[in-house]
A protein has these predicted regions:
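Charged linear interaction tracts used for macromolecular binding and regulation
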Residues: 37-138
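Leu/Val/Ala/Ile-rich N-terminal alpha-helices, chiefly Sec-type signal peptides and the beginnings
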Residues: 1-53
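Preference for long, well-ordered alpha-helical segments
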Residues: 130-167
Length: 167
C-alpha cells in the first residue's frame, strides 16, 4: 500500500476499492431519495387528512392515522436496507493472504454486485416516484416495493457470501 512517497493511488486494487465505495454510496443515495419521497408523501397525507385536534374532534380518524403510519413503515423498511448497504463489509487488507487470494477478481465480483445494487435502487426510486400524492399506499404498489427490497437484500447477501470466503 505504501511506496516510497506515500499511498499508491494508481494500483488497480486501490482504484477498485475506491470505486466500490463510490458505487455503494450512489446506491445509498438512491435509497435515501426513495425514503424521502415516502416521508414527503406521508407529510402531505397528514396535512390533508389529519387536521389539528379541535374540541369537536380531539382524536384523529384511525383509518387516516393508520395510512399515514403505513407510509412511515415502508420508508423505514427502505432505510433498513440502506443501513445494511452502508455497513456492508469490504475485503480485508491482509498482507499475508494477499498473494493467496485473487483480490482483483474478488473486487471485480463485488463491483458487479454493487452495479446490480444501483440498478435495483433506481427501480425502487422509480416506483416511489410514481406513487400518487394524497392517497394511501396501494397494496399492489407496496408489494412491488417489497419485491424491490427483497432483490436488494438478495444482492447484499450475495455480496456478503463473496466476502465470507475471505474470512
Amino acid at each position: 500500500m505504501l511506496n516510497g512517497y506515500g499511498y499508491n493511488w494508481y494500483r488497480l486494487d486501490n482504484q477498485m476499492r475506491a470505486d466500490d465505495l463510490l458505487v455503494r454510496s450512489r446506491a445509498s443515495e438512491l435509497l435515501e431519495s426513495a425514503a424521502a419521497r415516502l416521508r414527503d408523501l406521508e407529510g402531505r397525507y397528514r396535512r390533508k387528512y389529519l387536521p389539528p385536534p379541535t374540541r369537536e374532534h380531539p382524536h384523529p380518524d384511525p383509518q387516516h392515522l393508520a395510512a399515514a403510519q403505513h407510509y412511515r413503515a415502508v420508508a423505514d423498511r427502505i432505510l433498513e436496507i440502506d443501513t445494511r448497504l452502508r455497513g456492508a463489509p469490504v475485503p480485508p487488507d491482509d498482507k499475508i493472504w494477499l498473494r493467496q487470494r485473487g483480490e482483483i477478481e474478488t473486487l471485480q465480483r463485488l463491483g458487479n454486485c454493487d452495479v446490480v445494487l444501483v440498478a435495483r435502487a433506481k427501480e425502487l426510486v422509480e416506483t416511489a416516484a410514481g406513487l400518487p400524492a394524497d392517497v394511501c399506499i396501494d397494496p399492489a404498489i407496496e408489494q412491488e416495493i417489497d419485491k424491490h427490497l427483497g432483490r436488494l437484500a438478495e444482492t447484499l447477501t450475495r455480496r456478503d457470501e463473496i466476502l465470507a470466503v475471505l474470512r
